[in-house]
Amino acid sequence: VSAGETGREPDGANARAGNVRSGSTAARRPAASSDPVADSDPAAPASGGLSRRGLLGLLGAGAAGIAAGGAGGFGIAAATGAGASTHAGSGTQYPFSGDHQAGIVTPAQDRLHFAAFDVREGTTREELIELLQDWSYASSRLVQGLDVSASGAVGGSPLAPPDDTGEAMGLPPSALTVTFGFGPTLFVDGDGVDRFGLASRQPVKLTQLPRFSGDALQSELSGGDLCIQACADDPQVAVHAIRNLTRIGFGRVILRWSQLGFGRTSSTSTSQATPRNLFGFKDGTANVKAEETSATAEHVWVAPGDGPDWLAGGSYLVARRIRMMIESWDRVRLEEQEQIIGRDKRAGAPLSGGEEFTEPDFVVESDTTFGQPAIDANSHVALAHPAKNAGARLLRRGYNFVDGNDELGRLNAGLFFLSYQRDPEQFIRVQQSLSTDLLNEYLKHTGSGIWAIPPGARDGGYVGETLFS
């Protein structure tokens, strides 16, 4: 946060409580205002960094409140080690600004809250820009372990709703990252209307995904003009971020759908062990890792010249909500499970032999396959391998989910698949290749979406600024 901001909270594990840690209640709270917002232009920027509309969103779209004092702008410095916590989160911080958005090659955190939004009818281009500025300002604070504004959860007027909901007070940053994306319908809506003058700026590659084998998509779990991916090592920190960003957007966007995730199903760094999905197998062994800079340049980041220019340094995100038929899978023999996946369940080694990271051999036979390759040609490993997909690789960043149970008492559980790629065709190619996957018998795709992920915000700028400049 800008060093000139008044009432600035201190950095560290206890930063969320910040300027309300000591002193009497009277000393901590500004004097009540008669109504400083109602008589001012709602489009005018708030002095604390949030626009007046952003503050009105926090206050319930019309209630009076206290604007936080201080300078705008939100240059961020990377920092780590903010102290101990009684919660699962850590003091690790990742900067909000940078060449790329955080939350892509960042080491995958343990928890996710993902949300998709539609822009409300009647919202103008200027209001959309203002929303992105508000979201960027608030996110730049949240990733430091701060409240969404300087007055925060308990430092504002006692006669107005707090700016911040407060459930993350006292918690460290917990490696929080907040990543934003723009869907095809932001540029041209479902009726073909260019609401924000962005049609000419839409990436040619940003179109609705084709229908795939196994799709049973529900519209209420798919699409969205905008998306926000909040990842953290503490679930309360991730939920707090989405909750408060949704409040800031009140009156300008509507929450379309959201998904909670736990237990990452991929590693994005060589320092991380390969996790397991709900089928019990190691997942994402061959994932693109952050340390593979040549691979991220080739497969993840949109390069200058790929088009459009405003997206250079960004990526494309595909989300798929995949329900796993848990009860059916649990009755499958271990040997058959391994044949379906193409890997050993204990160590994750390919059935052709070796260890987890041994390159699969799709020709070698085994003593039990009677002249056939050890790895079935229709196994998941075989069909998803780059060798079978013209070299296409994805940076996967998915999570497990359990959303209760259905009317038959079966777990509504599965994989919330997230992949980042330089070109959506990479995902399409792999997904079409998986049409004969033996695993499909146990999967149902119920949600889907695609978004362009703009490059990172510059210091003092906002996410998406290159799109509107």
Question: Model-predicted segments: where are they?
Answer:
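N-terminal secretory signal peptides
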Residues: 1-50
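Long, histidine/aromatic-enriched segments associated with O2/redox biology
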Residues: 49, 54-469
